[in-house]
Regions:
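Hydrophobic packing residues in well-ordered alpha-helices of helical domains and bundles
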Residues: 1, 76-83, 113-116, 120
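Structural signal for well-ordered, non-membrane alpha-helices
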Residues: 1-12, 38-42, 46, 84-98, ...
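Residue-level detector of alpha-helix boundaries and kinks
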Residues: 15, 68, 74-76, 108-112
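Short, contiguous alpha-helical
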Residues: 17-62, 99-134
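Acidic/histidine-rich alpha-helical segments that form the ligand environment
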Residues: 63-101
Length: 134
């Protein structure tokens, strides 16, 4: 997370809105995507804890498009605030979980300990590639 945030914060204001940073997305759209997925993981893990139901988030492109559409009117400050608030909420949620939820061999542990960090890492690398070529 810290590395992802550091790389994203290092992108100039001029480049933040440019399409093509991550596929067709701008860096701002990537920030919304990452924040929305922090929220989605809370939902997935909570549902599993409550019901034992293992959920997959569905077709990722559909969910991504829905997330971006819902947040399309956020300005720069609101986008950064949404990213930080979502991560703070995610971390508060995770810190309140019992230890057994973090076993990487478990369903919840895979989401929390593998999927989320890899998500941050992957998009950090996307942004690094974008800034190197633009």
């Amino acid at each position: 997370w810290i590395q992802f945030l550091g790389v994203a914060e290092g992108v100039s204001d001029q480049k933040l809105m440019l399409a093509g940073a991550i596929g067709d997305w701008s860096v701002y759209q990537c920030l919304i995507h990452v924040a929305s997925w922090d929220e989605e993981v809370i939902r997935i893990v909570s549902e599993f804890i409550d019901s034992g139901t293992r959920k997959t988030p569905g077709v990722p492109h559909d969910l991504n498009n829905k997330q971006l559409e819902q947040k399309k009117d956020l300005d720069s400050d609101m986008t950064w605030q949404y990213l930080r608030d979502s991560h703070t909420t995610f971390m508060s949620y995770v810190q309140g979980l019992p230890e057994e939820m973090f076993d990487t061999e478990s369903y919840t542990g895979e989401w929390i300990g593998i999927t989320v960090p890899n998500h941050y890492k992957g998009h950090r690398e996307d942004i690094e590639r974008f800034t190197a070529r633009s």
